Amino acid sequence: MIILTGAADVIRLVTTSANALDVHVSWVDNQTATATPYTPGRTNTAIAAAATTTVLAAPAPSTQRQVKKVMACARGGANTVTVEFFDGTTAFRQLQVTLASGETLEYEDLCGWSVRDATGAAKTTN
């Protein structure tokens, strides 16, 4: 389970090449002090540079953001991808994988991380 609770808590991907990477993140916000305590959301990010990219922003004040799904698909060629939890001060490395073209790094709540090949078959599990 990945939960963001602080005003600066974000999930970032660090990529080592300019090959295209399509990223989808879905989550649920828990705001117990409101009439609608659970609000789902999603973010889609296209990465096309060797860079550090925030793929999930910090939650609003008094909100816990539970990550449900992360998918990062290497569309344009091989790319080494590092997943980081960043609290505004320190980057905590979660994992690093090298994706071949067409492969997808996937996180699913309660299942953890895996890599899928270009056909969608599970390749590895961390």
Regions found by a protein language model. Name each.
Residues 15-19, 33-64, 77-81, 119-126:
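Surface-exposed ligand/attachment interfaces on beta-rich extracellular proteins
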Residues 75-95:
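Short, surface-exposed beta-strand/strand-loop-strand elements in extracellular ectodomains
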